[in-house]
């Protein structure tokens, strides 16, 4: 009887040891899975911040300039009636703002899988807004002034983007001017010529610019729905 009892105890102890080992092993696997998911989430948030914030800022800067062109006589004041310095700034900075938006739109288009919007549906919505903006600039249903084909938009964006130590960034306005980038790139020359046409007759480009500004506002509302970065009163559609 003692031998049987001893055997039962040994068997029970063995089963407990196996069960404990199984629980430890499962716990370790669960922890590793959790750790991998958490690392993936943090990496996604990090990459999301790399793209979302610059895209948001670029969209705001461009829509603000378009609003000023259409509603505040920006080109009349600073290009048609301005000094040489003001004329230079009015054209070149506006071309830069378009190019800056193209850059971050291209970066997002390439790495859209890294933009953490919480669901694939929201990611698709961002893509739809981007396509609307791109189509607005390339469509021939408006006056041909400021018509920029999708391939040209992407090419300009590619030229503006930089990668330093694996980090994506966009050329700043100072670098844009000091590198004389605007003087030697045929697509920038094309965009500059189109902008000069707009400055001479804003009405010809008003439909395209209005549709563009509306699309950019939609992007702001999508990326910053709670008006944390930019208040609602600074997002008026023309």
Give the label of every model feature segment.
Residues 1-28:
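Short hydrophobic alpha-helical transmembrane segments
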């Amino acid at each position: 009887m003692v031998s049987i009892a001893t055997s039962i105890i040994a068997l029970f102890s063995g089963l407990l040891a196996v069960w404990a080992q199984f629980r430890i092993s499962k716990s370790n696997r669960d922890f590793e899975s959790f750790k991998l998911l958490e690392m993936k989430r943090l990496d996604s948030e990090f990459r999301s911040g790399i793209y979302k914030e610059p895209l948001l800022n670029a969209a705001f800067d461009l829509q603000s300039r378009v609003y000023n062109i259409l509603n505040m006589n920006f080109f009349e004041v600073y290009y048609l009636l301005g000094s040489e310095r003001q004329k230079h700034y009015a054209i070149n900075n506006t071309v830069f703002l378009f190019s800056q938006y193209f850059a971050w739109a291209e970066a997002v288009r390439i790495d859209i899988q890294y933009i953490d919007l919480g669901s694939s549906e929201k990611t698709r919505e961002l893509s739809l807004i981007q396509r609307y903006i791109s189509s607005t600039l390339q469509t021939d249903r408006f006056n041909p002034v400021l018509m920029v084909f999708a391939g040209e938009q992407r090419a300009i964006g590619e030229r503006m983007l930089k990668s330093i130590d694996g980090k994506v960034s966009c050329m700043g306005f100072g670098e844009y001017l000091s590198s004389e980038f605007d003087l030697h790139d045929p697509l920038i020359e094309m965009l500059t010529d189109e902008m000069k046409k707009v400055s001479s007759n804003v009405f010809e480009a008003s439909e395209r610019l209005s549709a563009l500004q509306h699309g950019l506002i939609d992007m702001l509302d999508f990326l910053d729905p709670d008006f944390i970065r930019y208040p609602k009163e600074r997002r008026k559609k023309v």
